[in-house]
Amino acid sequence: MKLQHIALVCLLALSAGNVTAQMLHRPDSMYTFTDPRLQKKHPWRAAAETFGMNVGVWAFDRYVMNEDFAKISIGSIRRNIKHGFVWDNDQFSTNLFAHPYHGNLYFNAARSNGLTFWESAPYAFAGSLMWEIAAEVEPPAINDLMATTLGGIALGEVTHRMSSLVLDDSKRGFSRFTREFLGTLICPMRGLNRMITGEMWKVKRSHYKYHDYDRIPVHFSIGAGDRYLADDNYLFRGEHNPYLEFRVQYGDAFDKVNDGTYDYFTARATFGLSGNQPLISQINLMGKLWGVPLKTTTGMEMMFGIFQHFNYFDSEEVIDGSGRIPYKISEAASVGPGMIYKFPRMNSLVNLEQRVFLSAILLGGSLTDYYNVIDRNYNMGSGYSIKNNTILDFGRYGMFALNMHLYQIFTWKGYEHKDLETIDPLYLNAQGDKGNVMLAVVNPIIELNLSSHFKANMEVSYYYRHTHYSYHEDIKYKTFETRLGLIYQF
């Protein structure tokens, strides 16, 4: 009888061991998002980090850089609250890229502490509001609040999800160091929180991956080559610059299961590698906030959704050129409806996809020909944009794409009836030259497959601007740029 009991206990123990082993090797046990212990939310820690970030940046500006704008007092805070918000005159890259990037840090202070997309959004707003009111003696800027909040949310969610692609808590040594370094470079606040919690150096046997490629596919590529920027639309009067570009398509627009906020987005970032042109020359982000599939009877897949957009194009004067800046275009805060549809396969045409978007621009910017106050040579305003993206994938041969952007931005609040001789430019409170601008960007792309990973890339971008000024002569301007390079598809 005792022998039977011993045999039964051994059998149960062996069975339990097998079940445990199976549980440890189940695909779900690989991913951090399936472990309830790792899904805890820390809103107060996120708030402390947001507050601490502002204090740290202010202290650096005040005591290391000795900046005048950082010499705050109780009186300056009261004055900012009493005076209210204005439109400031910082340079294009500061207002329409650096501020959104700063907002991404506020957003990710919450996102990396377990909060959801929508729960993290108020942190971007609160962090920006605190800075505008209390961290500068200059009047708070309404454009900074908008760009930091809405632009920061877009950049923040994209960088949060991109950092998940490289993190792997099962790795050790140099591989682990490289992954943690890249993850922190992509999303600094996530790296900071992983350092605080010890996750950065903790090695795990389960729940160690942060992204499931089978659940949400990701197409990522790196490109490099030569960019020719024409001056005033002249074919042989321009300059060549090397460039580095990153592209990603995250998720499947037609996935009916993984259809949460930003489970589908596209991103493109181009960096100029010469001293004359801006380091960051182009950023295009589009993320799905909400979407629903539409039924069709033709075999075509269709999806209607609400999308957030962030677009940024920047350039400077061409060397030995006319002295005119080719373009500056920003869509820092924008949201609106869109339709994506995919046609059935037709012979060698593996994929034909069409994307159409209509967006309300809450904050946008464009180069101006007249307004030039402090560091600002561009107008700001609101309006709308229409975008059309056509993609023809020919499988093993290559791909053709046509991207078309149309922006209409209205500058409502001008400066024309103010005395510029006596008014403090910090309190000018103007969006720029009153009027409106129509901007068009047409970008055909040809990619030829050289191997399973390498592609030749050829593209042209045509820029057109027609600015109507209420108190000045209207201006039309057009130019183009070409790119020739190689792409590595992961």
Feature-to-residue mapping (PLM):
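Outer-membrane beta-barrel "beta-signal"
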Residues: 196, 478-490
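Bacterial Sec-dependent N-terminal signal peptides
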Residues: 1-23
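Membrane-embedded beta-strands of outer-membrane beta-barrel proteins
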Residues: 244-248, 337-339, 386-388, 442-444, ...
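Small-polar-interrupted transmembrane alpha-helices in polytopic inner-membrane proteins
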Residues: 117-137, 149-153
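Extracellular loop and loop/strand-boundary signature of outer-membrane beta-barrel proteins
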Residues: 232-234, 320-328, 371-377, 426-433, ...
